[in-house]
């Protein structure tokens, strides 16, 4: 009787160093709160979601202003080291990608410095506090030749990518209208304190740059370039515990696109009952598409004449969870839904793939130029509110 071979454990360290080893890429993060947490979580999930990934993200260093908070974040998220000085992250030779999830007033200098140090960069939106600052970030980073990305995460929702595919295939025909709104309620209480998002020096703007930037980018991504725009900007509560509020609570706009479509943009932090509703509707000559971020796995669609019999015409609710839908080959069996956080995985996976393959960030992702163009549109909305006149949108070039 032959003796059976005892295999025992195989040491994974040997496997990782073998011929099929997947290269690591060092990540440096600025910001430990909302976006720093979301991005760190996504980076750690990439290898769980897709195998083999283009790189294995290595969480090298994280920086933030509060030492106690950034130390806790480094421990929770799994970073090797932390600092209260972003320059330590930018200068670290083990960092190849700099992820800027800090407040808006920390976008310009750290992002530019990282690019000049040879790091690929991704920066949260809004890119800068205004168009001038956003242009400077784009101009200086683009000159270095690194990959650069503005973190418009809604571009990576499978239902939104499906909508773009349907539009580009001509399924809804010529686009007539794009109507978008982004509604939240989190600052309605007059006793809610003045935080950095309510401070112009730190944030640049309020609902316009925070929420409006998303729907403006969606408009550009799905429909095309806005050409003329009007704006109404409003602050409802000007005094709060902690000081005077000098940013907007809400805005509304009418817009005319270069391709002849028209539409409306609206965002507010004063919509009672609305937690995080980013919703748009696109009407075309052959149909309509509707998306609501609070039901992110669904796309509401109507196609003229697609259902036999006039009495059965109407909208259909497409559950975007099949393996042939965008990014779903990485996830679960159909009907097993993904959530808000998972779209950051798609976003950062795209960045890693573009770095690995030396492929363009755009059009799937947003570049820093897209971030700058969004800022020009935001500034035009403010000018319209100040002057009472419709504004023509003009972009600078490099």
Question: Positions of the model-derived regions?
Answer:
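Predominantly a Rossmann-like dinucleotide-binding segment in NAD(P)-dependent oxidoreductases
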Residues: 146, 154-245, 252, 299, ...
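Core-facing hydrophobic residues within beta-strands of well-ordered domains
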Residues: 57-59, 95, 175, 226
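C-terminal glycine/acidic-rich active-site capping loop/insertion
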Residues: 2-21, 153, 228, 244, ...
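Glycine-rich phosphate/pyrophosphate-binding beta-alpha loops
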Residues: 213, 266-274, 336
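N-terminal Rossmann-like dinucleotide-binding module
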Residues: 2-77
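Hydrophobic residues in well-ordered beta-strands that form the structural core
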Residues: 83, 123, 129, 148-150, ...
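Beta-loop-alpha module in the N-terminal Rossmann-like domain of NAD(P)-dependent dehydrogenases
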Residues: 66-68, 77-140
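C-terminal capping/lid region of NAD(P)-dependent oxidoreductase domains
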Residues: 5, 146, 173-177, 383-398
């Amino acid at each position: 009787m032959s003796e059976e071979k005892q295999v025992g454990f195989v040491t994974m360290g040997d496997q990782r160093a073998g011929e099929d080893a997947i290269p690591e890429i060092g990540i440096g993060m600025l910001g430990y709160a909302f976006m720093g947490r979301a991005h760190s979580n996504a980076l750690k999930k990439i290898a769980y979601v897709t195998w083999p990934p283009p790189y294995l993200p290595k969480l090298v260093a994280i920086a933030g202003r509060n030492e106690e908070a950034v130390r806790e974040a480094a421990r929770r998220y799994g970073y090797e080291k932390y600092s209260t000085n972003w320059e330590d992250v930018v200068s670290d030779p083990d960092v190849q990608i700099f992820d800027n999830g800090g407040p808006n007033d920390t976008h310009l200098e750290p992002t530019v410095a990282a690019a000049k140090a040879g790091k690929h960069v991704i920066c949260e939106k809004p890119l800068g506090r205004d168009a001038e600052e956003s242009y400077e970030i784009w101009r200086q980073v683009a000159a270095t030749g690194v990959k650069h990305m503005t973190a418009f995460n809604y571009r990576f929702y499978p239902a939104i990518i499906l909508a773009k595919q349907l539009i580009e295939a001509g399924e809804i025909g010529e686009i007539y209208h794009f109507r978008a709104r982004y509604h939240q309620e989190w600052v309605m209480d007059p006793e809610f304190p003045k935080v950095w998002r309510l401070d112009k020096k730190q944030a640049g703007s309020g609902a316009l740059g925070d929420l409006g930037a998303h729907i403006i980018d969606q408009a550009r991504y799905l429909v095309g370039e806005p050409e003329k725009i009007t704006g109404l900007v409003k602050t409802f509560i000007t005094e709060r515990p902690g000081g005077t509020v000098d940013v907007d609570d809400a805005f509304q706009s009418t817009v005319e696109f270069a391709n002849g479509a028209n539409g409306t943009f609206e965002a507010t932090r004063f919509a009672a009952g609305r937690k995080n509703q980013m919703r748009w509707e696109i009407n075309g000559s052959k149909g309509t598409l509707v998306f609501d971020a609070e039901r992110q796995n669904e796309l509401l669609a109507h196609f003229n004449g697609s259902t036999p019999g006039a009495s059965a015409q109407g909208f259909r609710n497409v559950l975007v969870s099949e393996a042939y839908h965008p990014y779903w080959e990485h996830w679960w069996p159909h009907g097993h839904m993904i959530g808000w956080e998972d779209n950051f995985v798609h976003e950062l996976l795209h960045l890693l793939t573009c770095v690995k393959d030396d492929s363009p960030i755009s059009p799937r992702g947003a570049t820093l130029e897209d971030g700058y163009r969004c800022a020009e549109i935001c500034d035009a909305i403010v000018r319209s509110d100040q002057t009472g006149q419709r504004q023509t949108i003009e972009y600078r070039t490099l």
